[in-house]
UniProtKB/Swiss-Prot annotation:
Pfam families membership: KH_2, Ribosomal_S3_C
Domain KH type-2 residue range list: 38-106
Superkingdom of the source species: Bacteria
Protein's recorded name: Small ribosomal subunit protein uS3
Organism: Azobacteroides pseudotrichonymphae genomovar. CFP2
Family, similarity comment: Belongs to the universal ribosomal protein uS3 family.
CDD domains per UniProt: KH-II_30S_S3
InterPro entries: KH_dom (IPR004087), KH_dom-like_a/b (IPR015946), KH_dom_type_2 (IPR004044), KH_sf_prok-type (IPR009019), Ribosomal_S3_C_sf (IPR036419), Ribosomal_uS3_bac-typ (IPR005704), Ribosomal_uS3_C (IPR001351), Ribosomal_uS3_CS (IPR018280)
Complex formation: Part of the 30S ribosomal subunit. Forms a tight complex with proteins S10 and S14.
Length: 245
C-alpha cells in the first residue's frame, strides 16, 4: 500500500500535521468550502511566490493563515503593503478578522511542491524535460536529500501516444512511516496537452526504529518492551517464564 497511497496522508500525525486545524459543527461543509476558496485564491494570487503549503487555523472570531514560501519578500512587499492587501481581500472571503503568518522555506530544493512547480513552469517554457528533471534531481541531492523520484506523464516531446517516464536517485522508503517523505503533484499546460509531474523527496528518518516503536506502541495497545525488539522478553512471555526465573 505504500506504493499506492499518498505519502503525506499516510504519515499524518506522525511526520506532518493537518493543513486545516479547526472544529466544525453543522456548518462543517461551509467552512471546508471556504478553506478551499482561500487556498485557490492564494495559489492564484501568489503564483510567483513559490508557495509550498497553506495552513489554516480557525477560532470563533479569527482566521489564521500560515503561508509557507521560498520567497517571503514577494508576499510581504515593500513595508508590508502586500500583506495588508491580502488581509483585506481574505476578509471579504471569510467575513472575519484574518491574520497572515509567513514561514520561509530555507531549502526549496528539498520541498516537493516547489520542485514540481518549477519543473512544470519550465516545461511550459519549452525546455527539454529530461534536462529539467536531471537538474532538479542533482540540486536536491546536493542539498542533502536521501533520495528523490520524479515521474512525468503525458505526450512527451509531442508524440501521439501518451506515456510516463520515471527518474530516481537515492532511496525512497514509502513503506517506512518514520521516513520524512514529501510528495507533490503539478501540471504543465503545453501546446500538445497537459503534462503531469509527480515528485517524491526523502529527507531522512525522523525517528530511529526503536524510538518509533516505543513512542507509538501505546497507540496500538502493545507493551512497551514487546515492540522494542527485545527477543528475550518475547521468548519468556511465549514460554510462560517469569523474569526472576
Amino acid at each position: 500500500m505504500g506504493q499506492k497511497i499518498n505519502p503525506i496522508s499516510n504519515r499524518l500525525g506522525i511526520i506532518r500535521g493537518w493543513d486545516s486545524n479547526w472544529c466544525g459543527g453543522d456548518n462543517y461543509g461551509d467552512i471546508l468550502y471556504e478553506d478551499s476558496k482561500i487556498r485557490k485564491y492564494l495559489n492564484t494570487r501568489l503564483a510567483k511566490a513559490s508557495v509550498s503549503r497553506i495552513v489554516i487555523e480557525r477560532t470563533l472570531k479569527l482566521v489564521t493563515v500560515v503561508v509557507c514560501t521560498a520567497r517571503p519578500g514577494v508576499i510581504i512587499g515593500k513595508g508590508g503593503q502586500e500583506v495588508d492587501k491580502l488581509k483585506e481581500e481574505l476578509k471579504r472571503i471569510t467575513s472575519k478578522e484574518v491574520q497572515i503568518n509567513i514561514f520561509e522555506i530555507k531549502k526549496p530544493e528539498l520541498d516537493a511542491a516547489i520542485v514540481a512547480s518549477n519543473i512544470a513552469r519550465q516545461l511550459e517554457a519549452k525546455i527539454a524535460y529530461r534536462h529539467v528533471i536531471k537538474v532538479a534531481i542533482a540540486a536536491a541531492m546536493r542539498m542533502g536529500a536521501e533520495g528523490i523520484k520524479v515521474q512525468i506523464s503525458g505526450r512527451l516531446n509531442g508524440v501521439e501516444i501518451a506515456r510516463s517516464e520515471m527518474y530516481k536517485e537515492g532511496r525512497i522508503p514509502l513503506h517506512t512511516l518514520r521516513a520524512n517523505i514529501d510528495y507533490a503533484l503539478s501540471e504543465a499546460l503545453t501546446k500538445v496537452g497537459l503534462l503531469g509531474v509527480k515528485v517524491w523527496i526523502c529527507r531522512g528518518e525522523v525517528y530511529s526504529k526503536q524510538d518509533f516503536v516505543v513512542q507509538f506502541a501505546s497507540q496500538r495497545g502493545m507493551n512497551r518492551y514487546e515492540g522494542s525488539g527485545d527477543k528475550s522478553v518475547k521468548r519468556r512471555k511465549r514460554n510462560g517464564i517469569k523474569k526472576n526465573e
